Amino acid sequence: MSHYTLSWHDQLNEYHEIGEYATDAFEAVKHAREDVPYIHEHPFCLDTIIKED
């Protein structure tokens, strides 16, 4: 399991990040959608997904 940092901008152009532990990037996005209502409502808002070392 690896740590992923996901980032996005909301409708006010404010920058946000969330960290998720997952086996791959797809699972990290799935967890983020479950944890953050904005990502769930706007599934294509993610700017970056970075796998941390």
Regions found by a protein language model. Name each.
Residues Y15, R33-D53:
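Short, mixed-charge low-complexity intrinsically disordered segments
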Residues N13-E27:
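A short, exposed loop/beta-hairpin motif centered on an aromatic-Gly-Thr core
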Residues S7, A25, I50-E52:
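Serine/threonine-rich, low-complexity intrinsically disordered segments
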Residues H3, E27-A28:
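Generic alpha-helical structural signal
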Residues W8-Q11, K30, P37:
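Helix-coil modules at protein/domain termini and other flexible surface or pore-lining loops
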Residues M1-Y4, A22, D47:
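Intrinsically disordered/low-complexity terminal segments and short unstructured peptides
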Residues M1-H16:
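Short aromatic-glycine-(Arg/Gly/Cys) micro-motifs in beta-strand/loop hairpins
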